[in-house]
Amino acid sequence: MFVKKGDKVRVIAGKDKGTEAVVLKALPKVNKVIVEGVGMIKKHQKPNTENPQGAIVEKEAPIHVSNVQVLDKNGVAGRVGYKVVDGKKVRYSKKSGEVLD
């Protein structure tokens, strides 16, 4: 998967289109990512010892990886490619040619 935890991404589809944020978690088995502040859902929690009343908690839901583009250091969104530099496989932005890793 071309997106990793900590990458700055731009959402390119959906209700949060245009939002730029950081990837909190990558889920490669299901091709989804959790992006900070994107795809917020309300989750009802049962009462427990920490929260005796119960609560409605807002949290980020996973979005499909095809709905985000990785931003390089200059803030330019583009596709991600792979190349070998000094015997090590690195990710790079196909638009700017800048190494991401």
From Swiss-Prot:
GO biological process: translation
A single GO molecular function term of this UniProt record: structural constituent of ribosome
Gene3D superfamilies (alphabetical): 2.30.30.30
Segments crossing the lipid bilayer: none
Keywords from the named record: Ribonucleoprotein, Ribosomal protein, RNA-binding, rRNA-binding
Cellular component, GO annotation: ribonucleoprotein complex; ribosome
Family that this chain belongs to: Belongs to the universal ribosomal protein uL24 family.
Assembly, per entry: Part of the 50S ribosomal subunit.
Function: One of two assembly initiator proteins, it binds directly to the 5'-end of the 23S rRNA, where it nucleates assembly of the 50S subunit. One of the proteins that surrounds the polypeptide exit tunnel on the outside of the subunit.
Protein name stated in the entry: Large ribosomal subunit protein uL24
Organism: Streptococcus pyogenes serotype M5 (strain Manfredo)
Origin organism lineage: Bacteria, Bacillati, Bacillota, Bacilli, Lactobacillales
The gene coding this protein: rplX
